[in-house]
């Protein structure tokens, strides 16, 4: 009886892991999130990425609508894709 329960548990875990890897939700945090977004949104991989606009400075004007859209969305993508799992479609919605 114990063997049957263990086998069923192993099979269940395997199915869950496989489903998640086949296009289900994943968590993207830190550098992995940034690299994934660069590839999805701009087709840039780490090897060919150039530092663009590195000398641009955005001062805190108290008017967030004047900042680039990706600055405003930063917290949302972290909430949706780092603190909890998200799909590729959710990531693409932030491009």
UniProtKB/Swiss-Prot annotation:
Name this protein carries in UniProt: Bombyxin F-1
The source's superkingdom equals Eukaryota
Q: What subcellular locations does the record give?
A: Secreted
SMART domains named in the record: IlGF
Give the pro-peptide residues: 53-71
Q: Please indicate if the UniProt record lists Disulfide bond as a keyword.
A: yes
Question: Cellular component GO terms, alphabetically?
Answer: extracellular space
- Which Pfam families does this chain map to? Insulin
SUPFAM superfamilies from the xrefs? Insulin-like
Q: What is its main location?
A: secreted
Renumbered to this chain, the signal peptide range is: 1-19
Name of encoding gene: BBXF1
Cysteines paired by S-S bonds: 29-82, 41-95, 81-86
Task: List the transmembrane segments.
Answer: none
């Amino acid at each position: 009886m114990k063997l049957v329960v263990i086998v069923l548990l192993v099979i269940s875990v395997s199915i869950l892991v496989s489903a998640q890897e086949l296009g289900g939700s994943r968590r993207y945090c830190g550098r992995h999130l940034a690299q994934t977004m660069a590839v999805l949104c701009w087709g840039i991989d780490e090897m060919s990425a150039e530092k663009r606009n590195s000398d641009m400075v955005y001062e805190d004007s108290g008017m967030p609508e004047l900042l680039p859209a990706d600055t405003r969305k930063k917290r949302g993508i972290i909430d949706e894709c780092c603190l909890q799992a998200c799909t590729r479609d959710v990531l693409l919605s932030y491009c």
